[in-house]
Design a protein with these regions (language model features):
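Sequence/structural signature of long amphipathic alpha-helices
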Residues: 1-99
Length: 99
């Protein structure tokens, strides 16, 4: 048997004592995948930019801002992927049970 996910699952971003951002776990999987993909595409693009910069000319403040953005987007993307994975496992278990 599988665990029932709450409809709205909080995303822990460490910026508030109580959650502010939530994932709607009942959205279409394709929409959730697109949401995660968008975040990881932005992360990839930011990392491409960082890899092409001459870091000796970059201020510590700017580098911190970019790495914080990458971290936040990656956390959100991973949270969405975790929901997708749980739903995929539930679907597979339901399929196996019906055979």
């Amino acid at each position: 048997m599988f665990e029932v996910m709450p409809r709205f699952l909080p995303i822990d971003t460490y910026d508030a004592e109580t959650p502010v951002l939530f994932i709607n776990t009942q959205k279409e999987l394709s929409e959730m995948a697109a949401c995660a993909m968008h975040r990881f595409t932005v992360v990839r693009d930011l990392m491409d930019t960082l890899s092409s910069l001459n870091l000796k000319d970059t201020s510590d403040c700017d580098l911190t801002r970019v790495t914080r953005a990458v971290h936040l987007l990656a956390r959100e993307g991973c949270a969405v992927l975790n929901v997708i994975q749980k739903r995929a496992v539930q679907r597979e278990e339901g399929y196996k049970a019906s055979i």
